[in-house]
Amino acid sequence: MTSSDLTQRKGLTMSDSTPDTPRSTPEDAARRLAVLSAQNERLAQVLGEARGKIVELQQQIEEFAKPPGTFAVFLAEHGDGTLDVMSAGRKMHVGASPSVDLTQLRPGQEVSLNEAFVVVAAGGFEPVGEIVTVKELLDDGRALVVGRSDEERVVRLAGSLAGAPLRAGDALTVDTRSGFVYERIPKAEVEDLVLEEVPDIDYGDIGGLGPQIEQIRDAVELPFNHPDLFREHGLRPPKGILLYGPPGCGKTLIAKAVANSLAAAVARRAAAAAEAGGTVDGSPVLVETANQAKSYFLNVKGPELLNKYVGETERHIRLIFSRAREKASQGYPVVVFFDEMESLFRTRGTGLSSDVETTIVPQLLSEIDGVERLDNVIVIGASNREDMIDPAILRPGRLDVKIKIERPDPEGAREIFAKYLTTDLPIHADDLAEHQGDTAAVVDGMIQRVVERMYADTEENQFLEVTYASGDKETLYFKDFNSGAMIQNIVDRAKKSAIKDFLATGQRGIRVEHLVTACVDEFKENEDLPNTTNPDDWARISGKKGERIVFIRTIVQDKNGSGRSAAGRTIETATSTGQYL
């Protein structure tokens, strides 16, 4: 084959294998342009994200490379943009960033310093610290405080305490490095021992104690409502009142009613002064202030005052009277109520206890009539054993007024029953039918019936036979041990019986039989309670005073309460009465 033949064949082959190139249309160009634009947008977005990530990483690198900042405590500002601060125990004179408002800084406030020791930000006040007690307030925003181990030091008052009514004895938090006190801490030990709320009990809630209520109103409210007359006659109001008598007869209720009545008297007095545009104790009274007028009732939990550490009980008594003086200085009457007073203030030197009262009693005496006057404060003590209270407390000038709270007589029992057995209670239909539907008449009849049963001098009501030291014997009835608390319990028993009968029979309402049965059941529960081991102590607490009792015989009733068993139950008196309470 010649070269010309090969050339011809090659040319034919190339010409045969090469197709014709198609011509581009405008639609194809537009489509390719759209694809390229989308790719360009995605690329720009990725580049933007990468740029932002780079900037973020650069900022983190700069943050990591920064030197650590420090905190300091602001002391004073000099007016030229420079400050005195305390940092790490060192007093420093530094500058401040223009972004910091120096007029808002207060002494003791935290500030932030940069690496050049320039104040760049303001913070708050230190929320933690050691506890110290204020001993004396000094000039220029300083105070003398007592810390651990009775260590005394002078500290500065932080701006957070500006205007706070501080006084000696307040507990404060202190930052020992800067020497600032920041916050007043409530005294939990006093809060646990007293109750400042004014009770919602008034004299109308107390039955059977009309003469005693009149006595205590004359002693407490008369001097408060008419102070000018007392000053005119040179008469001082009583400093204290002793309520004594058997348990459950209303001593605590009377004390609460006194506080409530004083609060109402304060409100009336302030309201009258506000309407007249006058003053109370030299200060103008607004209507809003008059509406907030009240009194304080410090209910001291007596046994909780006792402490195993020497001097702690006396310190608690001082704190309580300090609290009372603080409230009284604001023009509010304060009632300090000691319940079970004999547990704290026994006769000194009797040897019936650990003799802690040798220092507790003098502390109370110094608080009541010591060098510091006790104005607008009335001390009320309640006790079942007034014979065990130290005579120095009971003398005139301390507990001036002594009111005996007797057990209720039949008329008093009717008044007490009427407080708990009211016409709004459901009454059984049969009892209503007997009185032509008159609910008030039904209730009066119920009360009359149960009081007659309770106070009857019958054999079924015999409770105890006591033998005195002289050999005389006396039979005591359940009425001799009746109390307001027992009457309330009888009514509650009757209500519960009425509920049980309704659930069993479907008949709703209280019946007179419920009350009589409740009275008998209450007697049954109490017949095992007399302390025949120490009969004289038990009788004194129960209100039976006079000749010493050496023997008690309980008279056991039949189960149905219809009569007395043939043999009474006796327990021999111990030869040594031992320690009581």
UniProtKB/Swiss-Prot annotation:
Biological source species: Sanguibacter keddieii (strain ATCC 51767 / DSM 10542 / NCFB 3025 / ST-74)
Subunit annotation: Homohexamer. Assembles into a hexameric ring structure that caps the 20S proteasome core. Strongly interacts with the prokaryotic ubiquitin-like protein Pup through a hydrophobic interface; the interacting region of ARC lies in its N-terminal coiled-coil domain. There is one Pup binding site per ARC hexamer ring. Upon ATP-binding, the C-terminus of ARC interacts with the alpha-rings of the proteasome core, possibly by binding to the intersubunit pockets.
Listed Polar residues bias regions: 14-24, 572-581
Residue segments, region Docks into pockets in the proteasome alpha-ring: 580-581
Sequence positions that bind ATP: G248, C249, G250, K251, T252, L253
GO cellular component, one term: proteasome complex
Protein name listed in UniProt: Proteasome-associated ATPase
Entry's Gene Ontology BP terms: modification-dependent protein catabolic process; proteasomal protein catabolic process
Region of interest (Disordered), residue spans: 1-28, 561-581
